[in-house]
Amino acid sequence: MNKMQGKKKKKEEEEEEERIIPPELWKLIIEQYKRQLAKTDVMKVSETVKLHEEKIKEKVPTDHIIHAQKPNAWVEETKKSGGCLLV
């Protein structure tokens, strides 16, 4: 069995020696890895932004936001006359 294992190891070593990766392929692999890292960074940032938005909504409910108001009679009159409203 030891002889068989020795032969297998030699074959594996020979296969590893044959696997020479050209520089172009290395550049491609590195570029893809950098892109993947950039995507994960963007995902992390977007997740933290969502978490911050949720916490803000929890602290400050949006019920108090001022909605469209009814028109004020005095303001409407001054707009028609073109003059200034003096108080």
From Swiss-Prot:
Membrane topology designation: Lipid-anchor
Organism superkingdom: Eukaryota
Keyword terms: Cell membrane, Lipoprotein, Membrane, Methylation, Prenylation, Sensory transduction, Transducer, Vision
Coiled-coil blocks: none
Post-translational modification: The N-terminus is blocked.
GO terms under cellular component: plasma membrane
Lipid attachment residues per UniProt (S-geranylgeranyl cysteine): 84
Subunit relationships: G proteins are composed of 3 units, alpha, beta and gamma.
This protein's name: Guanine nucleotide-binding protein subunit gamma
Originating species: Loligo forbesii (Veined squid)
